[in-house]
């Protein structure tokens, strides 16, 4: 004797109601064979819908066992139950349960998506089913554009999408007019004639008489289970004939043979590359569908989506802009430091800044400069000595800082010339009476427009010819107001100051040489020359590192403030997603009923949250570039610098925000009970 396809043994179903449990099904024993057409009849509250939910693996018994093709459903996990619903059951609901925001084809494709059917195959299958059920011209109509009878036919077509070995019809004619109801009953008869097992749940005995077997249920117990003596008459009434059956045959694609049982899940295909490839393709298809449905959901609620993204937009704009401002400021500061001489080491007499004995130390001499310049790690070395002296040109007298320097001083300091040229080594050797002045000195002595090159000025009563004028330097540290004059250090020592020692020596380290190692080497050399350490060094590299570290700290601080905005935006995403889950509870139930796994639902809502954040992140980055363009218009000195790393970080942050703040709503959605979800309005 062939085992029944569906079998309930001593099944009891209880639901908690306050401090007590309400028994909805009590010790139900029922067997349904493959290929039967059965009607379960009962009044409202009799337990017939709960029985159908258990038969369709949407619910589970509190006690007893339910087997499908010999497989005990109690031993199956949620994914295996979803597989049963997806591959062997088809549901026809009284309220149709179609997704309102997609067309008929998309509603039909849903079970096939979760079954991993390729897009082209499932699309062709959906259009074929609609054509067989007389809805070819309604394929791209949404449910709201269809009549009740048409919606129910779409529901039947969806039940057949994956084969539909067992069709569970819950009050299939309850919301239809008489003509549409007869059409639905006729279709169910045709499907049964092709080998589908049909279970009709109804309170209407006129509908029940279309089944070969009628099962009556009352107060959770089966009170009658008898064959229907009027089945032949009912069969003839709806006009089901051989022609109709043949016409529908191609539609169902040979439903499983009446004796076939659902095959057990196969977990031993991991080593076989073909199933692995199919699983990968199916997973990719489900992910693509999740992205498509997420986009449809976002577009369907444009204003809410925009408001949800607003926090992410502000957060990403803040993060990217602050990083760009910080990077631009750092580069500008380093350029400014470079203008006063980067990769340089200066030597001063004494032990440190403010040493009271520094004025009495006279050991820094021109010979030290020559010795340092010969070192392999040194690019150039220049001496420096300075005094404040009186300058005179015609009837104009001013005080200026007069510095005696070497010919490489201007290169070492990164100074540029507006007029004329610097003095050379020959001028230093000859103690030439030549001078280079800055723009402040030019304006004081000659005015802003007159060319001073070739003019003679008195420097503390020593005549000097102006041979060059340095260019103005706009500095982040403020513009320099002092007057500066540079003469050869030999001229300063022999003709102006009357001193043979130097105030300082500046060494420029060769490119590629480590500044710290060079500093140690020159200290060692100078100690050997002087016999003791009567000097200290000042390495500009330490200033650069300090500026970089300060810039990084400031950028980090401001970025943390911006991240707070991003977190607030993420909380907004989570709130809206929780609302979305509540609003779309029935959709979740529909997806679970047609075979969606918990992971599919989790993926659906997680993708939606990530998509919101990615869109917000993209808009935020675009706004940052717009702010950068405006910034360059109003701030001429320096620009915001956008790096690829900052942009990638922004996308990563927006994605992580979607994952982190979208996970809880998505998890809540995946954990919904299918029955509770379907019952929500």
Swiss-Prot record:
Segments crossing the lipid bilayer: 306-326, 554-574, 611-631, 644-664
One Gene Ontology cellular component annotation held by this UniProt entry: plasma membrane
PROSITE patterns: ABC_TRANSPORTER_1, ABC_TRANSPORTER_2, MACB
EC assignment: 7.6.2.-
GO biological process: response to antibiotic
Protein residues bound to ATP: 42-49
Example GO molecular function: ATP hydrolysis activity
UniProt-listed InterPro entries: AAA+_ATPase, ABC3_permease_C, ABC_transporter-like_ATP-bd, ABC_transporter-like_CS, MacB-like_ATP-bd, MacB_PCD, Macrolide_Exporter_MacB, P-loop_NTPase
Region (Disordered): 246-274
Subcellular location: Cell inner membrane
Signal peptide start-end: none
ABC transporter domain sequence ranges: 6-244
Pfam families xrefs: ABC_tran (PF00005), FtsX (PF02687), MacB_PCD (PF12704)
Gene3D superfamilies: P-loop containing nucleotide triphosphate hydrolases
Keywords per UniProt: Antibiotic resistance, ATP-binding, Cell inner membrane, Cell membrane, Membrane, Nucleotide-binding, Translocase, Transmembrane, Transmembrane helix, Transport
Membrane-protein topology: Multi-pass membrane protein
Presence of keyword Plastid: no
Main location: membrane
Role according to the record: Non-canonical ABC transporter that contains transmembrane domains (TMD), which form a pore in the inner membrane, and an ATP-binding domain (NBD), which is responsible for energy generation. Confers resistance against macrolides.
PANTHER family: MACROLIDE EXPORT ATP-BINDING_PERMEASE PROTEIN MACB (PTHR30572:SF7), MEMBRANE COMPONENT OF TRANSPORTER-RELATED (PTHR30572)
Family per similarity comment: Belongs to the ABC transporter superfamily. Macrolide exporter (TC 3.A.1.122) family.
Quaternary assembly: Homodimer.
Name under which the protein is recorded: Macrolide export ATP-binding/permease protein MacB
Gene assigned in the entry: macB
């Amino acid at each position: 004797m062939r085992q029944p396809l569906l079998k309930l043994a001593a099944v009891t179903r209880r639901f908690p109601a306050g401090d007590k449990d309400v028994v909805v099904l009590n010790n139900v024993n029922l067997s349904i064979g493959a290929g039967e057409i059965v009607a379960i009849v009962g009044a409202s509250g009799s337990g017939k819908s709960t029985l159908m939910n258990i038969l369709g693996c949407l619910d589970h018994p509190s006690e007893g066992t339910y087997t499908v093709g010999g497989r005990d459903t109690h031993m199956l996990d949620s994914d295996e139950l979803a597989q049963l619903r997806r591959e062997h059951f088809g549901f026809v609901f009284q309220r149709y349960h179609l997704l309102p925001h997609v067309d008929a084809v998309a509603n039909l494709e849903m079970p096939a998506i979760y079954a991993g059917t390729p897009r082209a195959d499932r699309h062709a299958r959906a259009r074929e089913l609609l054509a067989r059920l007389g809805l070819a011209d309604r394929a791209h109509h949404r449910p709201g554009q269809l009549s009740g009878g048409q919606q129910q036919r779409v529901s039947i077509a969806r039940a057949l999408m994956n084969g539909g070995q067992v069709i569970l019809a819950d009050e299939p004619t309850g919301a239809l007019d008489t003509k549409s109801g007869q059409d639905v009953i006729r279709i169910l008869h045709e499907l049964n004639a092709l080998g589908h097992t049909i279970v009709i749940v109804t309170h209407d005995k006129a509908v029940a008489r279309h089944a070969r077997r009628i099962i009556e249920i009352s107060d959770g117990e089966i009170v009658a289970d008898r064959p229907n003596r009027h089945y032949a008459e009912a069969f003839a009434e709806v006009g089901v004939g051989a022609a109709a059956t043949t016409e529908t045959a191609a539609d169902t694609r040979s439903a499983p043979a009446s004796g076939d049982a659902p095959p057990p899940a196969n977990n031993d295909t991991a080593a076989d590359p073909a199933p692995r490839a199919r699983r990968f393709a199916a997973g990719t298809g489900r992910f693509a569908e999740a992205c498509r449905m997420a986009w449809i959901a976002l577009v369907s609620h444009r204003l809410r989506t925009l408001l949800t993204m607003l926090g992410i937009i502000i957060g990403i704009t803040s993060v990217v802009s602050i990083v760009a401002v910080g990077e631009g400021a750092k580069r500008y500061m380093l350029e400014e430091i470079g203008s006063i001489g980067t990769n340089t080491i200066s030597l001063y007499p004494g032990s440190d800044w403010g040493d009271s004995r520094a004025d009495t130390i006279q050991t820094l001499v021109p010979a030290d400069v020559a010795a340092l310049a010969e070192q392999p790690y040194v690019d150039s070395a220049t001496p420096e000595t300075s005094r404040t002296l009186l300058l005179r040109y015609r009837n104009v007298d001013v005080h200026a800082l007069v510095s005696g320097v070497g010919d490489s001083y201007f290169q070492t300091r990164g100074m540029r010339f507006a007029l004329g040229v610097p003095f050379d080594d020959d001028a230093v050797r000859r103690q030439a009476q030549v001078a280079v002045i800055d723009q402040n000195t030019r304006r004081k002595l000659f005015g802003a427009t007159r060319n001073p090159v070739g003019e003679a000025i008195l420097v503390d009563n020593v005549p000097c010819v102006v041979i060059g004028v340095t260019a103005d330097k706009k500095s982040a540290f403020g513009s320099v107001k002092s007057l500066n004059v540079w003469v050869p250090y030999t001229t300063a020592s022999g003709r102006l100051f009357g001193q043979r020692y130097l105030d300082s020596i500046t060494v420029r380290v060769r490119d590629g040489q480590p500044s710290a190692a060079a500093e140690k080497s020159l200290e060692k050399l100078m100690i050997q020359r002087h016999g003791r350490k009567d000097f200290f060094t000042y390495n500009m590299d330490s200033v650069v590192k300090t500026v970089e570290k300060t810039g990084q700290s400031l950028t980090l601080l401001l970025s943390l403030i911006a991240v707070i905005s991003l977190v607030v935006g993420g909380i907004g995403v989570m709130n809206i997603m929780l609302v979305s889950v509540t609003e779309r509870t029935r959709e979740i139930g529909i997806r679970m009923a047609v075979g969606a796994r918990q992971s599919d639902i989790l993926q659906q809502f997680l993708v939606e949250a990530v998509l919101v954040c990615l869109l917000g992140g993209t808009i935020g980055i675009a706004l940052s570039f717009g702010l950068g363009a405006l910034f360059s218009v109003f701030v001429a000195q320096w620009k915001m610098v956008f790096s690829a790393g900052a942009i990638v970080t922004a996308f990563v942050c927006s994605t992580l925000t979607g994952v982190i703040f979208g996970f809880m709503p998505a998890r809540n959605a995946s954990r919904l009970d299918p029955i509770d979800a379907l019952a929500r309005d």
